[in-house]
């Protein structure tokens, strides 16, 4: 998909795109060059990366559907965008965990304690979306703060995360 960016590019742009791909996509054993904090407003996602660890927070709002169900993959991902936070040091911390995960207790999410099956979301109706627009982040590029108001399934929570060089 990244190679499709080169269509219509001049020689200099094509070289830059190839270098970007080589640096960031072709060698999974090499480090990504990004360090700092970035909030992606169109996706309700925050990424915080230091030389020694990284974290990401996945959220949803009334304008962003928090999770997808495609080809019956992610059948239990209903709560994935209710503030799920992933922290990494090595990069393989979540390898093969999904068959054993309690999908109501994913780090960072807010959900009812229940033995009932995780709700199905075979369509993208209103029940899948967070009912509030209050999801956002501020950053100076190195540190940042992310916040959300969760209002879904009758459950409400005000949630925030502060990202620094040393901690979340």
Annotate the PLM regions:
Residues 1-168:
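Extended polysaccharide-engagement surfaces of secreted carbohydrate-active enzymes
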């Amino acid at each position: 998909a990244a190679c499709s960016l080169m269509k219509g590019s001049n020689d200099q742009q094509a070289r830059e795109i190839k270098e970007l791909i080589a640096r960031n996509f072709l060698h999974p054993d090499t480090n990504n060059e990004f360090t700092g904090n970035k909030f992606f407003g169109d996706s309700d996602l925050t990424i915080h990366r230091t030389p020694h660890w990284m974290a990401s927070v996945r959220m949803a709002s009334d304008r962003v559907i928090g999770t997808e169900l495609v080809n019956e993959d992610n059948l239990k991902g209903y709560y994935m965008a209710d503030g799920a936070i992933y922290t990494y040091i090595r990069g393989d911390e979540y390898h093969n965990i999904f068959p054993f995960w309690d999908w109501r207790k994913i780090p960072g999410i807010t959900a009812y304690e229940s033995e009932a099956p995780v709700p199905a979301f075979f369509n993208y109706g209103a029940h899948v979306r967070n009912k509030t627009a209050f999801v956002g982040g501020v950053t100076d590029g190195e540190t940042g703060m992310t916040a959300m108001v969760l209002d879904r399934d009758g459950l409400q929570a005000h949630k925030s995360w502060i990202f620094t060089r040393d901690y979340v």
